[in-house]
């Protein structure tokens, strides 16, 4: 039976995706269209391209992770390095400033590159991490409970990111009654989110121990369906 401490440490691995999802949903498009001045159509296209890349890299990462043979385990090497592209992409997404005098094409390329990089970094961690949740125990109810914990922590992380943004970084000031229009608040907001991403990866990673092969997992799930 999985201990509560293990469930908590494993679930912390959902923090990066919770932060990323909240930011991409509520903040990213606003930043580029209202602060930096990228045309909304181009910003939307950049997000669409990143989603298309994600649709390819997610199943590809699953296949690669399943077939990996390493002294660290099948899942662990990718989770270990994931924080690098994840955090760099996330921070650089919010690095442009109004005085950089970038063209629409330059901004579009910048947004596309670092949105894709952030998603690739997230894929490197999230796909192996989710797969591990299906391997750590043979008990169906335990796996279900573990993944429930994971989703709950990810939801809390996303909600906390929103409160942190609106409550602190984008709080109203005399100069900017609508705090989100303050251009100086965005980069510190991104750096703070990236720090939480970076910290959550090793916390979750160090408590993971893979136990079963991919074949074991597939056959077990098929039997449970019957």
Sequence positions of predicted segments:
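Membrane-embedded alpha-helical bundles of multi-pass transporters/translocases
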Residues: 1-209, 214
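Positively charged, low-complexity/disordered segments
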Residues: 210-226
